[in-house]
């Protein structure tokens, strides 16, 4: 939503703005299935769609836009966001009319002007997209890039969460990150401008504000910002979340952060091996980082501390140091032990062959082996990290039972057809009443559902009133395993396993029957080994 707001403001402020009507973002954007979103798009009849692509939405976005173009042949498409880079593996087909690398605000008015004045014949012909680079445009001040403080688009979400950018640009030049490749200079809002935005968000119901600055304490007026936040949030009704550099943080600054009600601060450490840090351009003074994290803890700010694994030149000893580093804090911090991702446009991706990095071809581009660690070794590292720190969260504590917690919509049953399905949601539970005669339909229905909606989250629930052969359960697991992978599967599944996250199978036992505990345990183990 922040990207849409910035592009809206850029167009409204330009001479190109009067030529366009900006359609409101449909509420279905956050919760709709692909078909729901397609129906909304076709109903709105846009001339241009501008989409922000990230590693978690690019496959779905391209799939949806391809379908939209079949329904709206004259639709023009502009793609931007952190995923857009030259030689992107998913952007080889001529789907988009324009690709924007870097910040879209200085380029967007010119892009849509070009689309508007292009002759129809050239618009209708599918061709390679024109590439626009923000580095070739005059950079905007942040105050000129963001919507005005009182713009209606500046709203918290339904949960009271709002996002606010106060400083654009990062002092770090990390080889694994694409941020510094998109912008080299920095620009910021003045503290009083930020104060005005916080007050307005507060009046509009914000309870938590996440500052999206890549490094909040790199703001040139950092201490003045803290003093302002203390003043406008004296009653601490708003909680703030920030990302900072711990090695430059003083105790007094941490104290001021607490007074402003900054309750969480994310700190990236990544590695403590000097050789690794040199390759990824990540300078580190370990003692100063310790000092900064201790200051946060002393003032009751919970740090999220990030380390990475599968970095170039990283050996098992460095990984062990990283895990011990995180474990020593216990529950005082939120530890994150993250796989290295070869994001398009980053130095690490460009140097992958030279550095001996092998990664997934599709998002999230997770590194599968390095010059020093095999895939088997990385799988063992992931297992150790899960045992020490805990793995990815799962909303469903069990796969077999009379009560199954964490189901998306726990209602409705079907014998293999589409009853019991909430069609408009991007996360859906489909129930099947088991019987031997309808069992063949169940696998076919699962395949058909995922073929129709490959990007939403699916839970398939088999309701039973007797023990069923485990061969039947295994056959449905095979059906799901043969489906095209989802980006969440590629992110979460351990490297030495093929666990599925986006489509999962559950067994719900009728409340009136009692089944053999041994059968239940064996079935639970079977599903637990197949699904997250």
Predicted regions and their residues:
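N-terminal [4Fe-4S]-dependent radical SAM core
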Residues: 116-163, 409-425
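Generic structural signal for well-ordered alpha-helices
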Residues: 5-8, 62-66, 112, 162, ...
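Active-site beta-loop-alpha junctions enriched in small/polar residues
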Residues: 54, 82, 165, 214-216, ...
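Structural motif
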Residues: 52-54, 244-246, 429-440, 461-468, ...
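Conserved C-terminal portion of the radical SAM core fold
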Residues: 48-50, 76-78, 195-198, 202-212, ...
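C-terminal accessory regions of radical SAM enzymes
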Residues: 330-333, 344-465, 469-472
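Glycine-rich beta-alpha loop elements in corrinoid/cobalamin-binding modules
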Residues: 7-10, 19-141, 494-495, 501-532
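Radical SAM [4Fe-4S] cluster-binding motif and immediate context
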Residues: 147-303, 309-311
């Amino acid at each position: 939503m922040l990207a849409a707001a910035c592009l809206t403001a850029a167009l409204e402020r330009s001479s190109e703005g009067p030529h366009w009507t900006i359609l409101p973002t449909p509420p279905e954007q956050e919760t709709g299935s692909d078909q729901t979103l397609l129906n909304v798009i076709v109903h709105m009849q846009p001339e241009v769609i501008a989409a922000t692509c990230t590693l978690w939405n690019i496959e779905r976005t391209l799939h949806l836009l391809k379908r939209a173009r079949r329904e709206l042949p004259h639709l023009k498409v502009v793609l931007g966001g952190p995923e857009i880079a030259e030689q992107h593996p998913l952007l080889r087909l001529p789907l988009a009319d324009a690709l924007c690398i870097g910040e879209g605000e200085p380029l967007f008015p010119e892009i849509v002007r070009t689309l508007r004045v292009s002759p129809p014949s050239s618009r209708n012909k599918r061709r390679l997209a024109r590439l626009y680079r923000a580095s070739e445009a005059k950079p905007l001040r942040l105050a000129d890039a963001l919507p005005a403080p009182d713009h209606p688009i500046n709203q918290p979400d339904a949960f009271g969460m709002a996002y606010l950018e106060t400083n654009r640009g990062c002092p770090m030049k990390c080889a694994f990150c694409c941020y510094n490749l998109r912008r080299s200079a920095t620009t910021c809002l003045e503290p009083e401008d930020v104060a005005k935005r916080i007050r307005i968000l507060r009046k509009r119901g914000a309870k938590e504000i996440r500052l999206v600055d890549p490094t909040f304490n790199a703001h040139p007026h950092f201490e003045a910002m803290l003093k302002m936040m203390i003043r406008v949030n004296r009653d601490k009704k708003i909680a703030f979340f920030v990302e900072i550099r711990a090695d430059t943080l003083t105790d007094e600054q941490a104290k001021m952060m607490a007074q402003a009600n900054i309750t969480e601060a994310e700190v990236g450490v990544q590695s403590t091996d000097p050789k690794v840090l040199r390759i990824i351009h990540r300078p580190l003074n370990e003692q100063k980082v310790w000092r900064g994290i201790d200051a946060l803890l002393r003032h009751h700010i919970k740090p999220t501390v990030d380390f990475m694994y599968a970095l170039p030149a990283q050996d098992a000893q460095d990984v062990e140091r990283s895990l011990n580093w995180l474990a020593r804090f216990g529950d005082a911090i939120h530890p994150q032990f993250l796989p290295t991702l070869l994001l398009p446009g980053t130095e690490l991706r460009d140097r992958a062959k030279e550095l001996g990095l092998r990664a997934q071809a599709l998002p999230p581009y997770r590194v599968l082996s390095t010059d020093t660690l095999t895939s088997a070794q990385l799988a063992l590292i992931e297992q150790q990290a899960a045992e020490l720190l805990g793995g990815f969260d799962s909303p469903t504590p069990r796969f077999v039972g009379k009560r199954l917690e964490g189901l998306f919509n726990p209602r409705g049953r079907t014998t293999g057809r589409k009853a019991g399905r909430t069609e408009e949601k991007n996360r859906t539970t489909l129930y099947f009443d088991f019987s031997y005669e309808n069992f063949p339909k169940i696998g076919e229905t699962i395949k058909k559902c995922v073929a129709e909606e490959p990007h939403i989250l699916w839970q398939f629930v088999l309701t039973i009133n007797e023990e069923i052969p485990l061969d039947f359960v295994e056959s449905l697991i095979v059906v799901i395993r043969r489906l095209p992978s989802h980006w969440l599967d590629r992110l979460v599944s351990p490297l030495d396993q093929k666990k599925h996250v986006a489509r999962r199978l559950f067994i719900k036992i009728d409340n009136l029957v009692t089944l053999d505990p041994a059968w239940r345990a064996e079935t639970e183990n079977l599903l637990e080994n197949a699904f997250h």
